[in-house]
């Protein structure tokens, strides 16, 4: 039944490939989607409609959903990072509680001008900014998927940051005078 297969695919993706991700669950998801792809070949067209034949169109779109799910799950599995839609807790770095994102701009300026010294920032801030910068060099890229006949191949393309420099985000602060959200009504 194509509708049952669609429901299973949806449940698998919603359970394992959202914002917080885990490599073991992602690997299992990739395997499960391959199973759905095999099962799709045996889907029956359970069309009882006497007008417009919606089931054949749905079966065709289900195939496309499975292929796109392969791209999403494999791309997620390959990206070991800690931010945005690729958040994996095992790769998270601890942002110092008193860190202000704008200090990263100062860090990059000092580094570019050759004026960065070990005592330019607090040690934990400097360590955080260095790790953040290394992570950008590795993962500030778009994932590009191509189909090889058996599944997706994932490659990467650098993101142009010449107009806006990326900087760390701080989710535990509001704009209003940096009052913590827990204390802000």
Q: Whereabouts are the PLM-identified features?
A:
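Glycine- and aromatic-enriched mobile tails/lids
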Residues: 1-185
């Amino acid at each position: 039944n194509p509708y049952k297969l669609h429901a299973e695919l949806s449940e698998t993706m919603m359970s394992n490939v959202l914002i917080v991700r885990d490599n073991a669950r992602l690997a299992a998801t990739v395997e499960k989607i391959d199973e759905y792809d095999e099962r799709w070949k045996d889907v029956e067209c359970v069309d009882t409609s006497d007008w417009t034949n919606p089931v054949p169109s749905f079966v065709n779109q289900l195939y496309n959903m499975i292929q796109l799910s392969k791209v999403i799950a494999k791309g997620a599995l390959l990206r070991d990072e800690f931010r945005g839609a690729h958040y994996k807790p095992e790769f998270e770095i601890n942002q110092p509680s008193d860190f202000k994102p704008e200090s990263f701009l100062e860090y990059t300026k000092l580094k570019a001008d050759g004026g960065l010294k070990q005592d330019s920032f607090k040690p934990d801030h400097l360590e955080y900014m260095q790790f953040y910068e290394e992570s950008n060099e590795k993962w500030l890229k778009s994932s590009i998927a191509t189909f090889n006949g058996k599944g997706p191949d994932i490659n990467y393309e650098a993101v142009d940051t010449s107009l806006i420099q990326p900087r760390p985000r701080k989710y535990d602060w509001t704009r209003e005078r940096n009052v913590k959200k827990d204390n802000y009504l």
